[in-house]
């Protein structure tokens, strides 16, 4: 009974090198938008586009280097769960905004 918890599933844990690469990429992907916001040398639309692109890339970096999501068989369930969660959140936010805008326009018409 004392050894009931001896079975551990060894997942793909990252190495120090992997974590350092992820950390350095995260710093770079944070510094670029910060620099663009602090010194507005580009047009506003381009700045916003670059900041959004850096945010999306940073999400991917975090998923790969810190959450260890990849295309391996062991991570397949985690990837599908993440994709489903992303879909549900996108639907929740998108449809909520659609409802609020519809209500707003209906209130203006009266």
From Swiss-Prot:
UniProt KW Oxidoreductase keyword: yes
Entry keyword Transmembrane: yes
Transmembrane parts of this sequence: 19-39, 47-67, 79-99
An example Gene Ontology biological process: aerobic electron transport chain
Annotated family: Belongs to the cytochrome c oxidase bacterial subunit 4 family.
Quaternary context: Heterooctamer of two A chains, two B chains, two C chains and two D chains.
Protein name: Cytochrome bo(3) ubiquinol oxidase subunit 4
Organism: Pseudomonas putida (Arthrobacter siderocapsulatus)
């Amino acid at each position: 009974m004392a050894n009931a918890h001896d079975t551990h599933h060894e997942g793909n844990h990252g190495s120090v090198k992997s974590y350092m690469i992820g950390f350095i990429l995260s710093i770079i992907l944070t510094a670029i938008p910060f620099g663009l916001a602090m010194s507005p040398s580009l047009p506003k639309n381009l700045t916003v586009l670059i900041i959004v692109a850096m945010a999306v890339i940073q999400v991917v970096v975090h998923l790969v280097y810190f959450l260890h999501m990849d295309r391996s068989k062991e991570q397949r369930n985690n990837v599908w769960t993440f994709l489903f969660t992303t879909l549900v959140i996108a639907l929740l936010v998108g449809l909520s905004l659609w409802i609020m805008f519809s209500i707003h326009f209906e209130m203006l018409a009266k």
